[in-house]
UniProtKB/Swiss-Prot annotation:
This is NADH-quinone oxidoreductase subunit B. It comes from Ehrlichia ruminantium (strain Gardel). One of its GO terms (cellular component) is respiratory chain complex I. Its cofactor is [4Fe-4S] cluster. GO terms for molecular function: 4 iron, 4 sulfur cluster binding; iron ion binding; NADH dehydrogenase (ubiquinone) activity; NADH:ubiquinone reductase (non-electrogenic) activity; quinone binding. GO terms for biological process: aerobic respiration; electron transport coupled proton transport; mitochondrial respiratory chain complex I assembly. Binds 1 [4Fe-4S] cluster. It is found in: Cell inner membrane. Pfam families: Oxidored_q6. Keywords: 4Fe-4S, Cell inner membrane, Cell membrane, Iron, Iron-sulfur, Membrane, Metal-binding, NAD, Quinone, Translocase, Transport, Ubiquinone. The keyword Cell membrane applies. NDH-1 shuttles electrons from NADH, via FMN and iron-sulfur (Fe-S) centers, to quinones in the respiratory chain. Couples the redox reaction to proton translocation (for every two electrons transferred, four hydrogen ions are translocated across the cytoplasmic membrane), and thus conserves the redox energy in a proton gradient. It is a peripheral membrane protein. Its main location: membrane.
Length: 172
C-alpha cells in the first residue's frame, strides 16, 4: 500500500510541481493553476487600432511573427475576446466607444496599451481633444512603449501578459 502512494507522488505530473518548489494539496489550487495556464496560452485579442500603431499590430499578426503559435487568435467581436490591444491616439470622442467595447468583453479581461499615444497621449499630449492615456478610461495591464512600437515589442508585451496571467491564478 505504501508503494502505491509513493508511485502516485513520483508521477511525472507531480514532479513538475516539485521543480517549482511547491506541491498542491487542494483540488481548488490545482484547478486554479490549470485554468490560469490554459487562459494564458489561449489569448483572444480584439484590436482597437486608432493610428499608426495599428499597422505594427497587423505586422505582428502576419506570417513572420505568427501569433497563432502562441495560441493568440484575433477576434472581431468584443464578446469573443479577452484581451484588448489599444493602439494609437485616443481622442475624447472615441473614449466612450473604448469603454463600451471594454464593458462588452468577457471576464477576465485584459488590456494592452500599445504606443506612446495610447500610453500617455504621445505627440498630441497637450491637445484639447486627446485623452492623456487610455488608462484613464479602462484599466491597463501591460504598457508597450514606442512610437510606433516594433512588432517585437508588442510580442514581448503579449508574452509578459501571459506571464502575468500565470502568476495571478484566479478561481473560476
Amino acid at each position: 500500500m505504501i508503494n502505491k502512494h509513493n508511485s502516485v507522488l513520483h508521477n511525472q505530473f507531480w514532479q513538475s510541481y516539485n521543480h517549482r518548489g511547491f506541491m498542491v494539496t487542494k483540488l481548488s489550487d490545482l484547478m486554479s493553476y490549470v485554468s490560469s495556464w490554459a487562459r494564458s496560452n489561449s489569448l483572444w485579442p480584439m484590436t482597437f487600432g486608432l493610428a499608426c500603431c495599428a499597422v505594427e499590430m497587423m505586422h505582428t499578426a502576419a506570417s513572420k511573427y505568427d501569433l497563432d503559435r502562441y495560441g493568440i487568435m484575433f477576434r472581431a467581436s468584443p464578446r469573443q475576446a479577452d484581451v484588448m490591444i489599444v493602439a494609437g491616439t485616443l481622442t475624447n470622442k472615441m473614449a466612450p466607444a473604448l469603454r463600451k467595447v471594454y464593458d462588452q468583453m468577457t471576464e477576465p479581461r485584459y488590456v494592452i496599451s500599445m504606443g506612446s499615444c495610447a500610453n500617455g497621449g504621445g505627440y498630441y499630449h497637450y491637445s484639447y481633444s486627446v485623452v492623456r492615456g487610455c488608462d484613464r478610461i479602462v484599466p491597463v495591464d501591460i504598457y508597450v512603449p514606442g512610437c510606433p512600437p516594433t512588432a517585437e515589442a508588442l510580442l514581448y508585451g503579449i508574452l509578459c501578459l501571459q506571464q502575468k496571467i500565470n502568476r495571478t491564478a484566479t478561481s473560476t
